[in-house]
Amino acid sequence: MSDFMNRLREDHARLGRAVTAMRAHIQSPERTKRGGWLDLLASLVDYVAEYPDVVHHPREDRLFERLVDQGLTPAERQLVAMNLSEHAKLAEATERLMADVDAVLAGATLSETDLAAHALTYLDLQVEHMRREETQLFPLAERLLSEADFEALDKELDAQRDPLFEQRATRYDDLLEFIAA
């Protein structure tokens, strides 16, 4: 398997761990007693805005754009197009959730219960998006793209590292500790 595909799958595994931990925390009846959940959610959304939305999804877009020229069936073409447009929708959803988190932290009228429901919907979108890529799009790419395509994608793989799991940016220390717990 190519470095490019390995990287995409590794990114999914890492984000999946973060999403799973956050979902469990939000759904816990102890959420508000433990405190700090809003700060953790803010850190997670900030991370998604910084890395998956800005680095990971454009990498996937390059992969999927190569697929378009591979004689796809109409259903496969529709799946690729849907996924490409979904990346933009996920970025918008990230921005909306961050605005809601910021508003609650600033004392706005949005309740923590409503924010928790919004966050769970957002996390579900992320999970479903990654599931579709892992089960449908990545196998399609591996079946249709040539070794030369993957070599070209490997060369395009930029050096930008994951700020949460690789760079260990200090602003994400609490989030990383939370995920590891």
Locate each region found by the language model:
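Small-residue-biased structural context
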Residues: 1-181
